[in-house]
Amino acid sequence: MGRIIAVANQKGGVGKSTTAINLSACLAEKGKKVLAIDIDPQGNTTSGFGVEKNELENTVYELILGECSVEECLIKNVVKNVSIIPSNVNLAAAEIELIGVDKKEYILKNEIDWIRDQYDFIIIDCPPSLSMLTINAMTTADTVLVPIQCEYYALEGLSQLIHTVNLVRERLNPTLDIEGIVFTMYLSLIHISEPTRR
C-alpha cells in the first residue's frame, strides 16, 4: 500500500510545491512509483512537471465534484515513474461547490483509496490555507510534511498547522502524523535563520 504524504503549510511562498516536486522526483529517481496530486488552485506542481494546466479537460476539481474518475484525470509518466493528478484555477471554486455535501472531508480519500496500491508514494501538494482542500489532503494522508521558511514569523503559522493536524487526527484520521519539517530558503549568512532553526 502506497505511503501518502501531504505537503502542507497555510502560509504561501514557503516552498510547498517545490518540495512536492523535488520529493516526487527524488523518490522516482530511486525507482519508486510516485503519484503527485496537486490540490492547489495555483497549479504550480502541475506546471512544475511540464503540464499545461490551462488546457486540461479533467483535473482534481472534476474528480472532487464526481464529474470524472481518477483514471480520466490521471496523467501517467509526466517524468519517469511519476504520474500526476493535475490542478488549475478552476479548483478555487471547490470550497463553494462542497458546501452542504455530506462527508466532504473524505472525498479525496475515497477516490484515492482505489489506486493507492498502484504506487509506492503519493505526494499531495496542498494550497496555502487551512481550507477544506487541505483537510481533504490530511484526511487522506498518512503523514504531513511541513515546509517552513527560516524566519521568525513562520513559527506562528507552524503552531496553528500542528493544531489543525491534531484536530484532523482526533476527528477524521486517527493515524495521521507529522512526517517532519523541511527548512526552506535557509541562508546561513542571515542571523535570524539559525535561531529559527534551533
Name the predicted role of every residue range.
Residues 1-198:
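P-loop NTP-binding core
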